[in-house]
Amino acid sequence: MNGQKDVVQVSEAWQTLSTYLPPVTADRDYWWQLTGRHVAALVEAAGYPIEKQYEALIFHYHWTVPYMGPAPKADGTPATWKSLLGLDGSPIEYSWKWNTTRSEPDVRYVTEPIGQHPGSHLDPLNQHALRELLQRFSKNMPSSDMNMSWVNHFFARLYDHDNTRYIQEAAAGSSRSTATSVQLGTEFLRRGIGFKTYFFPRKLGQVDDISISQYGASMSQLDVDETSWDARKALVEFLETNPEGKSLRPFSLAVDNVAPSQSRLKWYFHTLHTSIDSVREIMTLGGRINGIDKQLEELEDLIRVVAGLASDFPTNAEIPLPKKSDVYDQSAKDNFGELEDVLTGYLYYFDIAPGQGKLPEVKWFIPSRHYGPNDRELASALGAWMEARGRGAYNEPYMKMLHTLSAHRGLGDGKGLQTFISCLFKPSGDLDITTYLGAEAFHPGRVAKMAKPNGRSPRATLRRGDD
């Protein structure tokens, strides 16, 4: 991976579709030219069959791009709505679930669909677009593939429904009152496309995130047997009694858009604790989850690789971060406002779906955008970790894909394209490793490269019959 040059390659599927799919509007054409290339590079690098590459791109063109909002303004900043998905306000984040010795990579992305009136009295929390999109999915897809029961439940329970008061709180200085509150996950799996809905609760009069008990109340109102909540009960006990558990702060909930009996219920938390010992304590739920010593050793090694730690770095020490000016700019600080703390520390989720087991599944996230001198070196270090474990088959395709995503800048010229790296322990003993990738849609280099004298993307002036 170290010797790979910054050469951008174009996939066959992208070349074909970009030639024949008709242009629509300047805004949609901009997002298609940018993110369509990214999706094409991801699914090709992951080794998807050509028909699955076309499926992902056609889905992206017809279902995702129309909800990405206006193209950037002339100065390269978001025109109407700054999503909290990216530090710069990008409304999309990709993910690359790494191969194991027995499996191929999977590609996913998360978007924040942007409506016609985000942040206004009509739609203060920018939820209309996502709800419209889900309704359209429900009409066009088999009921076995799309179920809205839990989605509708949490929409009703995790938000207040007084738009005027949200706007009043925003006018009084609360940036959270008109900020990202829902996101849509799209999984391009080889067996088909799946969806998840992410909720970021907003309650009037609360500056901080809602409490554990408020989340608990919303879950308790689900139509499930109370005796099936073993995993949730074990987690809450850990949160209430363990020092590391007490450091965790909830900020989101996510469900699969399938029948409740098949859905995960992922509860997301943030902590400022970053020591290796704290990771061990949380991944084992304070010793409740056992038999994972080998996986913990592998995870410790991964942390040292990603964070650039020496082999003798103490396991009880907090991992140092670079200065904030090195990891995000003023626009990101303005964008996140009261949520600034979540830009550092670790994230975890716990799958506490009722009836799925006595203990939750735990996933750890490190904000990899903070670490390493640049994106190339971070990718090379992670690739070496994969290679040492017999998982290096996709290292070169991954690096080529990164070059496509970073066409606006060299991989060695900065960091932040690889936003997070996560780890989940599988019953097989494998570590599920995922790298999350930012679009950097509003990066100055990106806008300069895409811009034309008329302010439109290259396809925006072409219409049917103009040949």
UniProtKB/Swiss-Prot annotation:
Range of residues in the leader sequence: none
Sites where the protein binds L-tryptophan: 93
Top-level class of the enzyme under EC nomenclature: transferase
Pathway involvement of the protein, from the record: Secondary metabolite biosynthesis
GO biological process: alkaloid metabolic process
Disruption phenotype: Completely abolishes the production of pestalotiollide B.
Entry EC no(s): 2.5.1.-
Keyword Nucleotide-binding: no
Key words, A-Z: Transferase
GO molecular function, one term: prenyltransferase activity
Induction statement: The expression of the dibenzodioxocinones biosynthesis cluster is positively regulated by the transcription factor dibT.
Described function: Prenyltransferase; part of the gene cluster that mediates the biosynthesis of dibenzodioxocinones such as pestalotiollide B, a novel class of inhibitors against cholesterol ester transfer protein (CEPT). The biosynthesis initiates from condensation of acetate and malonate units catalyzed by the non-reducing PKS pks8/GME11356. Pks8/GME11356 lacks a thioesterase (TE) domain, which is important to the cyclizing of the third ring of atrochrysone carboxylic acid, and the esterase GME11355 might play the role of TE and catalyzes the cyclization reaction of the C ring.
Family under the similarity heading: Belongs to the tryptophan dimethylallyltransferase family.
Full protein name: Prenyltransferase GME11375
Source organism phylogeny: Eukaryota, Fungi, Dikarya, Ascomycota, Pezizomycotina
